[in-house]
Structures are given as C-alpha cells and as structure tokens.
C-alpha cells in the first residue's frame, strides 16, 4: 500500500531463549497470566527448555530482577507478569508507576524486548477478566508483543 520497505516481526519463537518474571502477589491471577504466556510461546515454536520462570514477591521487585536477567545476556526477550489491585491507599499508584518505569528503563538500557503484562486493576473481577476470561489473557498479549518486537529488532 505504501510502496516502501516494511519490517514486521514474524510470530515464530523457535530457538529463542525467554525469561518470565512473575510476581507472587495475587498469584491466582498471575498464574493464569504465566500459563497463557508460556502456552502461547510454546505453540509458536519455543521449546520449554528455553523458557525460564523467575518468581518474585510482587510487582515492585520485578524491575530489579528483570535488570539482572537483561544484563546476563542469556535471553532474547523477557515477559513480566503481575497483578496489582487498587486498595484504599496510594500504594497502588506508586507500585504500578515504579514497576512500569523500571521495566521500560531496563528494556531501553539493554536493547532488549520486554513484554509488559502487569495488570493494574480496580477490582479482583477486572483482574480475572484480563487473565483469561472476558477480556482475553494479557499474559498472551505481553508474550506476543515481546516476540514480535524480538523479530523486528533482529531485522534492523
């Protein structure tokens, strides 16, 4: 349509080494995100022996562990997964903002695609909907975004 060279990422994860960083807080939700992401990448060719899951206490710990993984040079991409549900205090805002900023900075500093699957919901029902119910599985979406970005970057 535009008559120019276009680079797009193919959704083929064969041969890639992928790490997942998942918060244990709200694990009933997060486990569904992890399951969706792992299944998605396996269906797109990633061998299970090339996938590593690292569990951390919660969303606030995700950036530092993601940084360590990125700096190791062992992984082609990382998927971060967690669920933060709003409470009565501003704690929610601080945790969500710092996690997002930290993960984005790790991605930029290391030229490494990171799929961001941190649910930030007002209610547990919203989280359930986004973890494989009415609103799909945001773990799958994070894995897909990471995979496509890995393949785009390999062509640049």
From Swiss-Prot:
One GO term (biological process): riboflavin biosynthetic process
Q: Which reaction does it catalyse?
A: (2S)-2-hydroxy-3-oxobutyl phosphate + 5-amino-6-(D-ribitylamino)uracil = 6,7-dimethyl-8-(1-D-ribityl)lumazine + phosphate + 2 H2O + H(+)
Q: Which Pfam families match?
A: DMRL_synthase
Where are the active-site residues found?
91
Sorted alphabetically, the keyword list is: Riboflavin biosynthesis, Transferase
- Residues recorded as binding (2S)-2-hydroxy-3-oxobutyl phosphate, renumbered to this chain, are 88-89, 130
Q: Which CDD domains match?
A: Lumazine_synthase-I
Which pathway does the protein contribute to?
Answer: Cofactor biosynthesis; riboflavin biosynthesis; riboflavin from 2-hydroxy-3-oxobutyl phosphate and 5-amino-6-(D-ribitylamino)uracil: step 1/2
Q: Which residues bind 5-amino-6-(D-ribitylamino)uracil?
A: 25, 59-61, 83-85, 116
Known EC number: 2.5.1.78
Q: Does the keyword Transferase apply?
A: yes
A cellular component annotation (GO) from this entry: cytosol
Alphabetized SUPFAM superfamilies for the sequence? Lumazine synthase
Q: Annotated Gene Ontology MF terms?
A: 6,7-dimethyl-8-ribityllumazine synthase activity
Q: Which family does it belong to?
A: Belongs to the DMRL synthase family.
Name the HAMAP family for this protein.
Lumazine_synth (MF_00178)
Relate the protein's function as given in its record.
Answer: Catalyzes the formation of 6,7-dimethyl-8-ribityllumazine by condensation of 5-amino-6-(D-ribitylamino)uracil with 3,4-dihydroxy-2-butanone 4-phosphate. This is the penultimate step in the biosynthesis of riboflavin.
Q: What is the name listed in the Swiss-Prot or TrEMBL entry for this protein?
A: 6,7-dimethyl-8-ribityllumazine synthase
The record lists the lineage as: Bacteria, Pseudomonadati, Thermodesulfobacteriota, Desulfovibrionia, Desulfovibrionales
């Amino acid at each position: 349509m535009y008559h120019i060279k276009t680079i797009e990422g193919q959704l083929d994860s064969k041969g890639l080494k992928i790490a997942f960083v998942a918060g244990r807080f709200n694990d009933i939700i997060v486990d569904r995100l992890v399951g969706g992401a792992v299944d998605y990448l396996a269906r797109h060719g990633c061998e299970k022996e090339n996938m590593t899951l690292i569990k951390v206490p919660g969303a606030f710990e995700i950036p530092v562990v993601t940084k360590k993984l990125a700096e190791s040079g062992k992984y082609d991409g990382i998927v971060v997964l967690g669920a933060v549900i709003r409470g009565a205090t501003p704690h929610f805002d601080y945790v969500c903002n710092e996690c997002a900023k930290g993960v984005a900075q790790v991605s930029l500093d290391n030229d490494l695609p990171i799929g961001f699957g941190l649910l930030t919901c007002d209610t547990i029902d919203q989280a359930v909907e986004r973890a494989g119910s009415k609103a799909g599985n945001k773990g799958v979406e994070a894995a897909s975004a990471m995979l496509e970005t890995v393949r785009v970057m390999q062509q640049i």
